[in-house]
Structures are given as structure tokens and as C-alpha cells.
Amino acid sequence: MVKILVPGSDETRNRVILATNNQTQVKKTSLRATDQIHIQIELYMKRNGLYYERRKNYYKNQGRKREEIVTLSFLAQCMMSILLGRPDQARARPSTLLSDEVQYKKIFGQDGNLEAYYRAASLGKQVCLKFPQIKRDLEGSQISDIRFYVIMGVASMLSNKDSLTFGDIENLDLDKLSDEIIQTVADMVMDVYLALGGTSKAAKSYAMASKVKEKISLLLP
């Protein structure tokens, strides 16, 4: 006999999923999506025009545009880059950011500054959309290697700080984001990237993250 459950709400469904997953072999990253903070982020972003995809292809299958969709992994990568200053880790191990308990708690273990998550995601999406158009000479692999460095640098330029808190991210003025800022940061990051060999290995190294942060400090007033 098979018992079919028809949950009456998203919250009920999430509780059922969590209870079921705890009894089966499910990746920790999949379980993260049912954490209350991610449900709150999804609702908050939806009210502000972004769609936080806790379940793979959920909004894609509803016909939402790619530039409107924010995946859980992408938000984690943006926060890792902007909040923790580790674009190297965002590039090197995107799939494990959510399974690392220490890193996860640093990013999502707070009470939850929903506006900060929204602004980090919005900044990340805008940079990823404009960056390839501004730097048309770059190859796809180069864009993938340095985009989170550019996101980190742009956030620093907008805040005039080389180290950001949740409060700083919440107060980022995205109206000040310009092609000029993106190009300035991208040119600087690309110079560092090429000086270190211009490879994926370089982009995944702490040496590059450290050097880029040093260069960002020189760009700030």
C-alpha cells in the first residue's frame, strides 16, 4: 500500500521533504534547500523580482528568464566572494560550499539579513550579465575563472570598503553600478590573473585572491 501525501502549503511540503530525506540517502546540499532561511530568501526575492531556485529548474520550468533566476549555489558563491572575500573558493569548489558546515554557518547561519542576500544576488546577476558584454575579448573559460573576483571588486568599489559586513552588503547602492566600474575592476583582475599564469588553477588559488584584494585597496579612495 502506498500512502500519498498532499501538503496544503509550501511550509508543510518542506517539512515532509525534510522528514523523508532524513530517512534516506540524500546529499546534504539538497537538504539545505529546506532550511528556513532559504524559504525566507525565496519569498523575499520573489517580492523583489528575482526567483530563488531552491529546487533545480523549478523556476526555469515555469518559463522564468535566466537573468531572473538565482540558484542556491550562485548565492553562496556571491556571498563567499563579497562577505568572506574568498572568490578563489567560490571558483574552486562551488558544489562543496553548502556541505562545509563552517562556511555554511558563516554565510547562512545568521538570523538572516534578507536584503543583504537580495543585493548580493542582484549585484552578482548584473555583473555576470554585463561583464561579458564589456570584455568581449575574453574567452568563456576566462570569464568563468574571474567573474567572482569581479563581483567581489565591484562590491568593494560600491561600498568604498575592502572588507564588507552583512550591513555593508545590505546598503550597497546598486544604482551606482556602471560599466566603467565593472571594466576598471575586470581589467585589474585580468592583469593579476594573467600574471599568475592565466589558468583555472590560478583562479582557484588563495594567492590570486590575496593579490586581487591588495589591488582593490589601491582603487579605493
Write out the residue ranges for each language-model feature.
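C-terminal catalytic or substrate-handling cores of phosphate/nucleotide-
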Residues: 6-163
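C-terminal accessory/interaction regions of large nucleic acid-associated machines
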Residues: 149-221
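Active-site beta-strand/loop microenvironment that shapes enzyme catalytic pockets
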Residues: 1
